[in-house]
Regions:
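Universal eukaryotic N-terminal targeting presequences
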Residues: 1-5
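Primary mode marks residue(s) on the alpha4-beta5-alpha5 output face of response regulator receiver
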Residues: 6-60, 69-237
Length: 237
């Protein structure tokens, strides 16, 4: 069976001459890293460590219907693309989450990933949820071990939420988040920013099937460590 066709939609090409990741390092040095958080909120605080990665996430938020007739989060899955070089082209960097979300919404329902060939930026890893270390509930994971960091057993981070704030764009987009490391060596702090899409409908019929909702975001990760796969990356806004 032939693979399902992607929509006719063109991502802006990565800037020429800026390189692609090679084994053991990422594409671009970030220069001065800065994370710009929404004004008027106190739930998220600026990173205490150097920004090490900035990633474009393209995937799904997952939800289950409760007996109360409302949706509860059941985690998320996403591909993580290296957008380290886009800091050199602010017009693209500042809108890449919108460009990706437009393409992702146009993709047929049977297409579960846009893929690096469609996006045009290197795939670094995956975002998913795993059983929490306590054995109860689930925790978010950012994992490079199956893609850009094969053979690196600690090339992941399992995290816990520190805080969340409503996206500056409103309730149509999932919240911005700050998280902290629980396991792994990929990062000490993680931020979900520049979100597009992802929230569940307000109500559901108890007993109905789980749903998935498309979303995109930037993920900004910081670390004290000299990363095993990096030079440090760019600011997040």
């Amino acid at each position: 069976m032939a693979a399902p066709a992607l929509p006719s939609f063109s991502f802006p090409k990565p800037p020429s001459g800026l390189g692609k990741p090679l084994a053991g390092r990422l594409a671009c040095d970030p220069g001065a890293a800065k994370l710009v958080l929404p004004t008027g909120q106190t739930a998220l605080t600026a990173p205490t460590d150097v920004i090490s990665y900035v990633l474009l996430g393209v995937g799904f938020q997952n939800y289950t219907c409760t007996d109360a007739g409302t949706y509860a989060s059941a985690g998320a899955v996403a591909d993580l693309f290296d957008i380290s070089c886009l800091n050199k082209v602010p017009a693209i960097f500042n809108s890449i989450q919108d460009i990706a979300y437009t393409a992702w919404k146009l993709a047929p329902a049977n297409v579960k990933t846009l893929g690096a060939s469609a996006v045009g930026y290197p795939l670094l890893g995956q975002h998913f949820f795993a059983t929490s270390p306590s054995g109860t509930g689930i925790s978010p994971v950012w994992d490079f071990r199956a893609t850009s960091a094969k053979g690196k057993a600690d090339a992941f981070v399992l995290a816990a939420k520190v805080g969340n704030t409503t996206a500056p764009t409103g309730a149509k987009d999932v919240d911005w988040l700050q998280l902290k490391n629980v396991q792994g060596s990929l990062a000490t702090q993680i931020y979900r920013t520049d979100t597009r899409g992802g929230p569940a409908p307000a109500t559901c019929t108890p007993g109905s099937a789980p749903i998935t909702v498309k979303y995109t975001s930037k993920y900004c990760e910081s670390s004290l460590f000299a990363c095993f796969i990096c030079v440090r990356l760019i600011h997040c806004a």
